Regions:
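Short, solvent-exposed interaction modules
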Residues: 76-87
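Hydrophobic/aromatic residues within the transmembrane alpha-helices of Major Facilitator Superfamily
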Residues: 15-19, 47, 78, 105-106
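Structural motif at transmembrane-helix junctions in multi-pass transporters
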Residues: 30-33, 86-102
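Hydrophobic core positions of alpha-helical segments in small-molecule transporters
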Residues: 40, 102-103
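Membrane-interface interhelical linkers
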Residues: 1-12, 19, 29, 35, ...
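A generic hydrophobic-segment detector
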Residues: 1, 106-107
Length: 107
C-alpha cells in the first residue's frame, strides 16, 4: 500500500523550492542585499519552526538529546544558508527555471 503523505509532501517541497527562491529574490530587491534577504528568510523560517515545535510532545526535552550530536550534525544550517544565498544571487542573473535546473543538475 502506498503512503501518499510523503509523496504529497515531496511534491509540495518541489513546488515551494522555486517559489521560495522567487520570493527571496523579491525581498532582495527591497532590502538591497542578498545576505540580508537570506538572513530574514532564515529568521522567519526559524520563527515558523519554533511555533511548530511548540505543538510537539515535550519540545524542550528534545533539545537535551542534541548534547551528544557530533559536530557535523550541526552544519546543516550552513548548507541551507549557502543554498538560499546562492539561489538569491543566481535568480536575477539567470532566472528561476535555469537556477533550479542547475541546482538539480548539481544533485
Amino acid at each position: 500500500m502506498t503512503n501518499w503523505l510523503p509523496i504529497l509532501l515531496a511534491i509540495l517541497a518541489g513546488v515551494l523550492t522555486p517559489t521560495q527562491g522567487a520570493i527571496n529574490n523579491k525581498l532582495t530587491q527591497f532590502v538591497g542585499n542578498p545576505i540580508l534577504s537570506s538572513f530574514i528568510s532564515f529568521i522567519v523560517g526559524s520563527i515558523a519552526l519554533g511555533i511548530c515545535l511548540l505543538f510537539t510532545k515535550n519540545p524542550f526535552a528534545l533539545f537535551y538529546q542534541t548534547k551528544d550530536a557530533p559536530l557535523i550534525a550541526w552544519t546543516g544550517g550552513i548548507c541551507g544558508a549557502l543554498f538560499i544565498t546562492a539561489i538569491i544571487l543566481a535568480i536575477p542573473r539567470i532566472g528561476v527555471t535555469m537556477t533550479f535546473s542547475l541546482a538539480i543538475l548539481g544533485q
